[in-house]
């Protein structure tokens, strides 16, 4: 039987500067990270529910493995930068990616009910993708809209697109 999750609830973490940290089996709920920086950190089997990374939070060379991000009011942006990060067998369900930038990131797992907005979206909604690899993702009800630039993005095979689309503007 796996060990229980450590719970962290209703917290605001500001201006953290962490390097080479391991977070294992943590359930974050109603948690906010603001103006924080993470270098070479790993989250293993963590859950993120109604959480946000925002106000300039940055991730460099971080690894998220078997993590789950879900629920309304779960935000990965506002603004947030992920650079050279790996999301391995992670699930993203009903979350917001507003004002988020992914640079040289790799994903595998599940996207369900996500919208990626391009530069023609209202201010603050754009997601920027630069050299991103979504090849290992199963996309369910996932849309790419408002002129998002996918020219450097590796997309999954057609059989991993379930009711998902790239909208032309």
Task: For each feature predicted by the language model, list its residue ranges.
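Tandem repeat scaffolds
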Residues: 1-167
């Amino acid at each position: 039987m796996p060990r229980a999750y450590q719970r962290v609830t209703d917290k605001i973490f500001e201006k953290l500067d962490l390097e080479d940290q391991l977070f294992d089996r943590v359930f974050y709920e109603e948690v906010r990270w603001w103006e924080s920086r993470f270098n070479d950190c790993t989250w293993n089997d963590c859950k993120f529910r109604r959480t946000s990374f925002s106000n300039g939070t940055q991730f460099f060379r971080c690894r998220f493995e078997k993590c789950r991000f879900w629920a309304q009011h779960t935000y990965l942006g506002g603004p947030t930068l992920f650079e050279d990060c790996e999301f391995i067998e992670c699930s993203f369900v009903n979350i917001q990616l507003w004002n988020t930038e992914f640079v040289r990131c790799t994903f595998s797992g599940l996207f369900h009910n996500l919208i990626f907005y391009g530069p023609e979206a209202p201010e603050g909604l754009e997601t920027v993708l630069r050299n991103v690899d979504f090849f290992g993702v199963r996309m369910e009800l996932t849309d790419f809209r408002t002129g998002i630039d996918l020219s450097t993005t590796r997309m999954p095979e057609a059989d991993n697109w379930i009711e998902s689309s790239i909208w032309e503007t």
